Amino acid sequence: MRRRLAIAFSAAAALAAAAPLVSGPSSQVAWTLETVKLARSGNAARGKKLHQDCAQCHGEAGNVDIPDVPDLGGQNSLYIYKQLSDYKAGSRTSSIMNDAVQTLSDHDMADLAAFYSAQKPPRSTGKPALPNDAAVKLATVGDGVRLIPACDACHGDRGAGNPSFYGMSVLKDRKSQDLTVQLMAFRSGERANDVYRVMRDLCKHLTDSEIAALASYYSETPPEKLPAPSSASK
């Protein structure tokens, strides 16, 4: 574990040092103590009422059987709050979400985040994937040569979450296609709301096959054909 973290943080530090000086946080959310307190103050009951306007796409409890719609049940509340805030500010783009969140207040977003994080996480519907050496290495050790830290060092073991990092997403059992689309969007720069460009700088080193393998590894489903990049902003 210590070796994994050492590799992860060494690579992350190198990435930060290599990034242009003007590449500050790409998100409108600054994790001050006040922001964290607000994001964690959400009321799930109020969030459930607000969710009624979201249920057509995201299902009754935040999970829906549509490949490119993300599952929200059991997701980190701070991550959800950040994404909603970024959609509203325009630092994350989506033809649907940018309009959908414009009437939400900061407290509304905290309430929705509390509701979704309190729901049951999605369950994998496919057969478990066979272990993939490339995915396991990237997830647990990383690749120091390419300055790629272990994914699990930030996202938790098997992507189950890491409360030590504010706003860190849960990857475990999320849809393979959605994970693939998001990694591809970070790689191309189409998605640019990662703080200090960390995900973009990591993903630019990943091959198509590595992205597919990581998506399969965390979703615990067999690899699927890579989706078209044009769906990445959903």
Please provide the spans of the model-predicted regions.
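Hydrophobic, ordered structural segments
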Residues: 78, 83-124, 136
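Electrostatic cytochrome c docking/interface patches
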Residues: 22-51, 65-66, 118-147, 230, ...
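N-terminal export/targeting leaders of redox proteins
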Residues: 1-37, 85, 220-234
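Inter-heme linker and motif-flanking segments adjacent to c-type heme-binding CXXCH motifs
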Residues: 63-64, 90, 118-133, 138-145, ...
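C-terminal capping alpha-helices of c-type cytochrome domains
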Residues: 22, 102-125, 177, 201-233
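Gly/Gly-Pro-rich "capping" loops immediately C-terminal to redox-active cysteine motifs
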Residues: 37, 44-48, 62-89, 98-103, ...
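The canonical Cys-X-X-Cys-His
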Residues: 47, 54-61, 112, 148-157, ...
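Short linear capping/connector segments at secondary-structure termini
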Residues: 32, 96-100, 130-134, 167, ...
